[in-house]
């Protein structure tokens, strides 16, 4: 879909390629030590407690290395499609968006489409690298995620780990009834005037307009009633 490029992360893809090479080289030497810049982990589905233990162990190792060497580290997670229990995915996503690993950048690598609860883990990463023919979303697999679980996921997103992912995008992935629009917003005045592109619901756009904000262009990304899955 032409209006969903906000999910694609060119920098993340480059980082993933670099880290995969370094990890392959290190695996022949010492599989128990992090690479020079980070670690690449391939997760299996369903995601469970073993995955939590694996990811958290590596993330904390990398955080220790980042503090010792006074530089950021990267943890790349290859996330599969599949059916995982909500609490298992949420627990890991909660750790990744928490305060224990401030110097570790989490990158989600999606070589294939990821739907269902596994998509929540990708959304908790700071960067998302997605293959050109893959999609991310449809968290409820055609149905709305229950309201209490939607709010839990949105609380994770609001921690601001990924500045390109906002409530409206995630809500569209969790609730087929939600719509998503690509809106051009005019901010500032006179010489300070500029245009920003934001992804918002039609309700949010109307509120901006009611508040006097100029919205000269709106393009529909997902209509209400459609599944929210983006490339």
What are these regions (language model features)?
Residues 1-13:
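Bacterial N-terminal signal peptides that target proteins for export
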């Amino acid at each position: 879909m032409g209006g969903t490029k906000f999910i694609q992360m060119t920098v993340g893809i480059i980082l993933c390629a670099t880290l995969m090479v370094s990890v392959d080289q290190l695996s022949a030497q010492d599989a128990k030590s992090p690479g020079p810049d980070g670690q690449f982990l391939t997760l299996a589905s369903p995601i469970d407690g073993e995955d939590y233990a694996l990811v958290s162990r590596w993330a904390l190792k990398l955080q220790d290395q980042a503090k010792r060497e006074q530089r950021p580290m990267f943890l790349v997670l290859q996330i599969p499609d599949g059916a995982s229990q909500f609490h298992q995915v949420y627990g890991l996503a909660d750790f990744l968006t928490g305060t224990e690993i401030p110097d570790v950048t989490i990158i989600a690598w999606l070589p294939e489409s990821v739907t269902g609860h596994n998509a929540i883990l990708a959304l908790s990463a700071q960067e998302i690298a997605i293959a050109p023919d893959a999609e991310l979303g449809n968290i409820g697999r055609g149905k709305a995620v229950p309201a209490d679980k939607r709010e839990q996921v949105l609380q994770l997103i609001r921690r601001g780990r990924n500045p390109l992912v906002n409530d409206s995008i995630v809500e569209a992935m969790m609730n087929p009834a939600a719509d998503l629009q690509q809106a051009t917003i005019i901010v500032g005045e006179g010489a300070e005037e500029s245009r920003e592109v934001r992804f918002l619901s039609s309700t949010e756009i109307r509120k901006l307009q009611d508040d006097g904000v100029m919205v000269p262009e709106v393009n529909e990304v997902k209509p209400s009633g459609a599944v929210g899955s983006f490339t």
